[in-house]
Amino acid sequence: MARHLPLILLPFVLSCASPARAATTADAEELYRAKRYVEAQTAFEQVIAAEPTNANAAYHLGELAVMRGAPEEAVKWLESAPALVPKSARYFHELGDAYGLSAEKAGLFSKLGLARKCETAYAQAVALDPEDVEARYALFTYYRQAPAIAGGGLEKARAQALEIRKRDEVRGTLALAELSVAEHKFDEAFATLDDLRRRHPESLAASYQFGRAAAMCGQRLDQGAAALRQYLTATPDENQPPLWAAHWRLGQILEKMGDKPGARVEYAAALKLNPTQPQLLEAAQRLK
């Protein structure tokens, strides 16, 4: 019958006769690994529509929502994933990230409850897989940053840093250096980082943390600038500080050294990578 239709209509007829195949979990994961996130979102939505109890699809939809900065959607999906698979440390870790994002964006009266949920999710991830360094580092960061009323505390953070060091010497030592900086013990931080960089010159994260400490305290500025420039020659992975942060810290160092034109260049580079970060906007405005 189609042969009697105008040729221009044939593609339409054929497309109706052969509907597109719905995405599978494997299709969606392949798109995600390729960082084709918009397509991955659509694919995982197709998977969850066909399989409402697919915990892996729910997890990835929540992870994508975290990446987009959409806390309500992230929490919805990431609460459902561990409900379906309650023994997954990975699911609880990402749920903690979703609660943390929600706490950042929540009103004053909701922040504390969401922060506590964040801590609980991270702690559950660590309990399920004590060897998971990333989950421990998330819990370490929570304890380092959160106020005591929300369960935070530097001694709790130190305990996690020591546990991390048992499993990953570089990562754990970096965490201890971060604690020294948080306590404004900069000489101690520099000593720790000097030793780490001497023993592990390949550690880009150590270079970043050295530069960050220099930017914060105003000491060893030349070395701090060199360390950050070294970091900026690389492509950090998702578990390392983003490049915009390195540009920002380098800008702070150059500003302290009196090189305002150089600082402007670094702040502009940071803003190009992260145009909504308040600290960057303030720094760029200050040096106009």
Give, region by region, the residue ranges found by the protein language model.
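Canonical tetratricopeptide repeat
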Residues: 60-63, 94, 138, 175, ...
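Residue-level recognition of tetratricopeptide repeat
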Residues: 29, 63, 97, 104, ...
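TPR alpha-solenoid repeat register
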Residues: 57, 91, 135, 172-174, ...
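Register position in tetratricopeptide repeats
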Residues: 33-34, 67-68, 101-108, 145-146, ...
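N-terminal leader/linker segments that initiate helical-solenoid repeat arrays
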Residues: 18-67, 90, 288
